[in-house]
Structures are given as structure tokens and as C-alpha cells.
Amino acid sequence: MIDSYKLSLVIPMYNVELYIERCLNSCINQNLSPNEYEIIVINDGSKDNSLSIVEKIAQKYTNIHVISQINGGLSSARNTGFKNARGQYIWFIDSDDWIEPNVLKTLYDAASQNDLDILRFAWNIVDEKNQKYSDSSDAIHMPIYNKCLSGIEYTKKVLGTVLYVPSFLYRREYLLEHSFFFKQGITYEDVEFNTRIIPPASRVMSIPQICYNYFQRNNSITKHISQKTIENLSFILTKLIERKRTFSECKNYFDWLIDGFICWGIILCSEGNIETQKLFINVLKKNNIRKIRKVKSLKNKVTSLFFNINPWFALLTIKYLRRSYKFIKYKL
């Protein structure tokens, strides 16, 4: 077994028998030799045939390592992969997604030659009809492509950008040095993780190459509404407010994120019960949030218009609209 690699690809896996082979094959079809990178698959208690599919493929490649654990969720599986990784840089890849052919050398060279803590790259969204859509934040990153910035400067310049973990490469020593692990048991782990680790980084860069394909399934976990989802939303909102104070130079970026999460919370809570709604409204009151200003999308502008009159008015109005006009259910 090799002591160190250039890259570690960490793939958490749970019940993805329909997609894991595509994901693994994309990681194999690369332009680094097998002794230069490793693929770590974390079987997070899968109950389908995912594990047998991976084990069959792993028999053919010495750089594929499989670790099984009791189901602990996405963050737990990512942390397990991180703890076992030996690469200079780590790429966290979701098991129903796939990466572009022959991108590993490009990513490693960009990260290592610029001595980066974090590298961000472009990605596609692919729906179940195999329609591809470019990441909408590409235009935002264009002015800073191939420019090495501090984490603070980078964060200030990417207002409107989705902080999607698989679209970043992370230097392992940077994560270890600061004990940057994923928060377990929450839904919005990508935002929580990246808003914690990007601002304090010394060297961050974006490159324009499309390296990743995000598969958007209709039954995505982020589309399910439950009280736990609202509790997680309240948790991440509180964290973002704290980080706006800690990283005050990035106030505009955190304001945009906070306002977006408030709008999302109002939309979700409009379908929830009174206890769920009270929980979310109390979080807003506790943090003295009364107005929404920094939103861009039409759905958020409509939501903010109602919210700025009164949060309860926003909840009741959106609930009425979504139930009275079914087509709005998919637009708000």
C-alpha cells in the first residue's frame, strides 16, 4: 500500500446501486496513474447492491479502497474518508454524480503549483432527462479565474455563488491543521463547512474548467420538508449570523446567504405546522432579523416582499398561494 498520493477522491455511498458504477468509472478514466491517486469509497450502511458493485470493481484496481461503517449520514462518511485519506489534496465526490474525463492532472497541477489551500472549479447540473445546465455562478467567478486570493478576498468577490463541496479541492494538511471536519447530523453541511473553512484560508483560486457533473434527482434530500429540516435550517442560519460577525470583511456575502436561507425557510415553513413555524420565527427574532434585502431570484424577491411586511404575513400568504395555485408550488 502506497504511503502518500497526489489526490484522494472520497466517495460517501448509501443505496446508490443505480449510480455508483458510473461514478467510479469516471474516477478511473483519468490522466494520473493509479499510484498517484486513491479512490476511497465509504459504504455508509448501504442496504442495496451498492457495496457488491464497488467490491467487484475494486478487485481490478489497487488504488480503490472500500471502508464500511454503520450508517451515520453524509458528513460522517466524509469525515471517515478524510481521516483515512493520504493524498496531498482531497476531493469529496457524491456517489450519484460523476467527474469529467482526464481532469485530475489539471486539478492537481493548478493546486500544487500555486500552493493552494482550496481550489474551486466549474461544474454542470444534469437532470434525470440527461439535460445539462452550466453552473449559474460562472459569470461571477470569471473576473477572478486563475487569480490566487486570500480566503477573505475570495469570499468578498463570489457573492451569489453556491458553496457546493464537490466543486472544491482541499489541501489535506490545511484541513488537518485546523481540525476542519464536517458537522454531523445536519442538512446544509456544504454551506456550514465552506463558510467555516474558506475565509481563514491563505490561498484560494478558481479555474474555469468544468470538472464535475451534479446529478439532480427529483427525490433529492434537500427537497423533503420535515421539522428536522427546519431545525437544521435554523442552526445554519444562526451559524451564518455568527460568521458574519467573525468575518466582518465578508459582510455582504454573509448577508446574501442569510437572506437566501430566510426566504428558503419561509417557503419551507409555509408547508409546516405551527410549532415548526414558531421555531423558525423565534430564531429570526432572537437574531433581530426584520428585513430581507440582498436577494436576486424572483422567488426570493416575492418572498422578501411579503416578509418585509411581516414574517407571519409571508408564511400565510405563501401557504395560500401554493395551495390555491398548484403551479406556484414549483416556483416558490
Tell where the protein language model's regions lie, with residue ranges.
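Cell-envelope/extracellular polymer assembly enzymes that use nucleotide-activated donors
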Residues: 5-8, 26, 38, 192
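Short aromatic/hydrophobic "clamp" motif used to bind/position activated sugar donors
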Residues: 90
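Catalytic core of nucleotide-sugar-dependent glycosyltransferases
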Residues: 209-217, 223-249, 264, 272-290
